[in-house]
């Protein structure tokens, strides 16, 4: 492209501080350095994790460009890039895969050493590629997709099938893959099992889809918002309940419902109390509980160790357990083969300039996933 090697001026949604709205600004995006890729974003989803930066529950320096769930096309590449080239359709990866560190080399690992889940805010060389009004702007989780152009490390980019529709396939960059993988890859749900999903947002619905695909015979969805039940049932839940409908602890309610046969539970909210509830609700000896929801920073869990002593398994789950560069292209292929339906998760599509409206839909509970298009 004619812009290769040049600074690009473009539009981005910049966050200048905690609890502030996004400001649509003109920014400058520097060319990619060695082993980096500059990507033109085509569509990006709004995820609850982005809101953690707005609310201050995740650490970040400001100003920052957040967003991490997207599809784009490679505009240019830096020296030494071999896995993608200009014109390739790609999904940015908030969880990179360097294919060299211990986690990448272990068949069960996926938390690459190059991950930025702690708010470092810069690329591998310690600098940013974004400038706005003469000030450096921070990156977010190696991705920063709320902008027309972004720069990523080569390890944070997956080449995908060019037929993938950006406004749908972007969900594979985070929300869908995280939930679906929690069931089929992390928990390894077995046919005929009983599963319980705490939290029926977009990721929770994706967990349900994964449980159904794995052959679970009973899938119970839990949420305090009953407006979410219809969609949960549509994607595969067999029944839904609200904790507000009983004075009993939810673990007792579930035990009464199932005869104490729950093999898998999933916490997809990020609340400490619900994490313990989910652990308490799976079978005391052979149950597995998976923490999927991003926990708040600097908080500690308190729980009875007997919950684990009797044999339960408590697992964490980042990006569904997938090895990002290896598995994301496969998931896109499965989507194109109609093995799962992402349309059920997308409730709103808005132009990028309406990003603040998209977050209001998130706060009001009216949206499952809102996708912004450029």
UniProtKB/Swiss-Prot annotation:
Binding site for Zn(2+) 2: 98, 101, 104, 112
Protein name, per record: All-trans-retinol dehydrogenase [NAD(+)] ADH7
High-level lineage: Eukaryota, Metazoa, Chordata, Craniata, Vertebrata
Subcellular location: Cytoplasm
Any one of the GO BP annotations: ethanol catabolic process
Protein role: Catalyzes the NAD-dependent oxidation of all-trans-retinol, alcohol, aldehyde and omega-hydroxy fatty acids and their derivatives. Oxidizes preferentially all trans-retinol, all-trans-4-hydroxyretinol, 9-cis-retinol, 2-hexenol, and long chain omega-hydroxy fatty acids such as juniperic acid. In vitro can also catalyze the NADH-dependent reduction of all-trans-retinal and aldehydes and their derivatives. Reduces preferentially all trans-retinal, all-trans-4-oxoretinal and hexanal. Catalyzes in the oxidative direction with higher efficiency.
Reaction(s) this enzyme catalyzes, per UniProt: a primary alcohol + NAD(+) = an aldehyde + NADH + H(+); 10-hydroxydecanoate + NAD(+) = 10-oxodecanoate + NADH + H(+); all-trans-retinol + NAD(+) = all-trans-retinal + NADH + H(+); 9-cis-retinol + NAD(+) = 9-cis-retinal + NADH + H(+)
Cofactor field: Zn(2+)
A GO cellular component annotation in the UniProt record: plasma membrane
Highest rank taxon of the organism: Eukaryota
Residues that coordinate or bind Zn(2+) 1: 47, 68, 174
This enzyme's EC code(s): 1.1.1.105, 1.1.1.1, 1.1.1.66
Pfam family, one: ADH_zinc_N
Tissue expression remark: High expression in the stomach mucosa. Lower expression in eye, thymus, skin and ovary. Very low expression in small intestine, liver and uterus.
Keywords: Cytoplasm, Lipid metabolism, Metal-binding, NAD, Oxidoreductase, Zinc
Subunit-structure text: Homodimer.
PROSITE patterns registered for this protein in UniProt: ADH_ZINC
Cofactor note text: Binds 2 Zn(2+) ions per subunit.
Record-stated family: Belongs to the zinc-containing alcohol dehydrogenase family. Class-IV subfamily.
Activity control: Retinol oxidation is inhibited by the detergent Tween 80. Ethanol inhibits both all-trans-retinol and 9-cis-retinol oxidation. 13-cis-retinol is an effective competitive inhibitor of the 9-cis-retinol oxidation. All-trans-retinoic acid is a powerful inhibitor of all-trans-retinol oxidation. 13-cis-retinoic acid is a powerful inhibitor of all-trans-retinol oxidation. Cimetidine competitively inhibited ethanol oxidation.
GO molecular function, one term: oxidoreductase activity
Binding site for NAD(+): 199-204, 223, 228, 292-294, 369
């Amino acid at each position: 492209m004619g812009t290769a090697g040049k600074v690009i001026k473009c539009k981005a949604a910049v966050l200048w501080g905690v609890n502030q709205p996004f400001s649509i600004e003109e920014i400058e995006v520097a060319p990619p350095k060695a082993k980096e890729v500059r990507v033109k974003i085509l569509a990006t989803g709004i995820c609850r994790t982005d809101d953690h930066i707005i609310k201050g529950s995740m650490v970040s320096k400001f100003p920052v460009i957040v967003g991490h769930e997207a599809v784009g096309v490679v505009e240019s590449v830096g020296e030494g890039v071999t896995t993608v080239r200009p014109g390739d359709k790609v999904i940015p990866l908030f969880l990179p895969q360097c294919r060299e560190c211990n986690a990448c080399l272990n068949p069960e690992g996926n938390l690459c050493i190059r991950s930025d889940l702690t708010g470092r805010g810069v690329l591998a060389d310690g600098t940013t590629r974004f400038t706005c009004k003469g000030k450096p702007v921070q990156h977010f989780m190696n991705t920063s997709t709320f902008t027309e152009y972004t720069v990523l490390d080569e390890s944070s980019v997956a080449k995908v099938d060019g037929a993938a529709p950006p406004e749908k396939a972007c969900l594979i960059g985070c929300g869908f893959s995280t939930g679906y993988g929690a069931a089929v890859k992390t928990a390894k749900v077995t046919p005929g099992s009983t599963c319980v999903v705490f939290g029926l947002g977009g990721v929770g619905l994706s967990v349900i889809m994964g449980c159904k695909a794995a052959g679970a015979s009973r899938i119970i969805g839990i949420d305090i918002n009953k407006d979410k039940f219809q969609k949960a049932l549509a994607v595969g839940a067999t029944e839904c309940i609200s904790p507000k409908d009983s004075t009993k602890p939810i673990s007792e309610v579930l035990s009464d419902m199932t005869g104490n046969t729950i093999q898998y539970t999933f916490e997809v909210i990020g609340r400490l109390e619900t994490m313990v509830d989910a652990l308490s609700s799976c079978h005391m000896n052979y149950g597995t509980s998976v923490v999927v929801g991003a926990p708040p920073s600097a908080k500690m869990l308190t729980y009875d160790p007997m919950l684990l002593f009797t044999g339960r398994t408590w697992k964490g789950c980042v990006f569904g357990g997938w090895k990002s560069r290896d598995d994301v292209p496969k998931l896109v292929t499965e989507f194109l083969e109609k093995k799962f339906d992402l349309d059920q998760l997308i409730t709103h599509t808005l132009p990028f300039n309406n990003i603040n409206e998209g977050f209001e839909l998130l706060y009001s509970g009216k949206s499952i996933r809102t996708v912004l298009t450029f």
